[in-house]
């Protein structure tokens, strides 16, 4: 029996990457020691971190107008780091509340003394649709507009085609769909993504920031560890970076390139998610929760509308080698995470199981 991991994060990693990590963990042919033992000042690690940045720039078409940094602390640290660095003119940000992580970004800004205005929220229907900008939105009133491209918990996504159009600054949390579908980086002024969903293991967060915007900021009262400029100036080595996480990230980026890049990943993710959504939409037992136009490619959320039954089915799934299918505690139901490394066979196995469960519980 093949086991499949549907966890929302840390998420599934490509098997070739895991195999390479296993083979090189004790002794790498270039470092002659374990990757977790090498110095972050060594030429070997310099090659690794340079490669990771080059691969990411290549995959996302990131121009030299943007700086790329690899930072510790996860997306939660970015919730505070972003307004500390960029909300220093009006001390006010705008947020589209599309889910738990968008809401947390707003709360974090308030915690550090900034104003956070919720322009629109889809909380009223449990985030099953996406909040959008109104026609009277005035970007001049805010330092920037923040959104979450993919809402990991609730399963709704701002795809490139439905991104809100603003003449102001736009920032995004792309933690759970970075490299899963194409985005034009030039539409954003800052992007961050925790690696543990679609880029690699936990421990490193990617930050992509527009250099000219950063230079405009007065950050003299911002702690040194929370300044993007320090990471850019020191090539992500302002302090000891997460060596292993960046090493693994580089391997994942290499794997994505070998698969044909983001466009190839996008096509595969459409195929995987469409197959599952089609099954759910044609079932009278299961129900996909998100409006069709906003459905996530990477986090498919659904339910039978019976909490105890959902829990029983998720428990049964583990016996069939299908792990971590339970939805987030705030939503319930099921969540099947179909990140880049998730094979189509996992979706086939899931659908086969769901049909079996329907017969058993209907």
UniProtKB/Swiss-Prot annotation:
GO terms for biological process: L-serine biosynthetic process. Its cofactor is pyridoxal 5'-phosphate. Binds 1 pyridoxal phosphate per subunit. Signal peptide: none annotated. One of its GO terms (molecular function) is pyridoxal phosphate binding. Pathway: Amino-acid biosynthesis; L-serine biosynthesis; L-serine from 3-phospho-D-glycerate: step 2/3. Keywords: Amino-acid biosynthesis, Aminotransferase, Cytoplasm, Pyridoxal phosphate, Serine biosynthesis, Transferase. It comes from the Bacteria. Its main location: cytoplasm. The keyword Transferase applies. L-glutamate binds at residue 41. Pyridoxal 5'-phosphate binds at residues 75-76, 101, 152, 173, 196, 239-240. Its EC number is 2.6.1.52. The modification N6-(pyridoxal phosphate)lysine is found at residue 197. GO terms for cellular component: cytoplasm. PROSITE patterns: AA_TRANSFER_CLASS_5. Coiled coil: none annotated. It catalyses: O-phospho-L-serine + 2-oxoglutarate = 3-phosphooxypyruvate + L-glutamate; 4-(phosphooxy)-L-threonine + 2-oxoglutarate = (R)-3-hydroxy-2-oxo-4-phosphooxybutanoate + L-glutamate. Pfam families: Aminotran_5 (PF00266). It is an enzyme of class 2 (transferase). Belongs to the class-V pyridoxal-phosphate-dependent aminotransferase family. SerC subfamily. Catalyzes the reversible conversion of 3-phosphohydroxypyruvate to phosphoserine and of 3-hydroxy-2-oxo-4-phosphonooxybutanoate to phosphohydroxythreonine. PANTHER family: PHOSPHOSERINE AMINOTRANSFERASE. This is Phosphoserine aminotransferase. It comes from Leuconostoc mesenteroides subsp. mesenteroides (strain ATCC 8293 / DSM 20343 / BCRC 11652 / CCM 1803 / JCM 6124 / NCDO 523 / NBRC 100496 / NCIMB 8023 / NCTC 12954 / NRRL B-1118 / 37Y). The lineage of its organism: Bacteria, Bacillati, Bacillota, Bacilli, Lactobacillales.
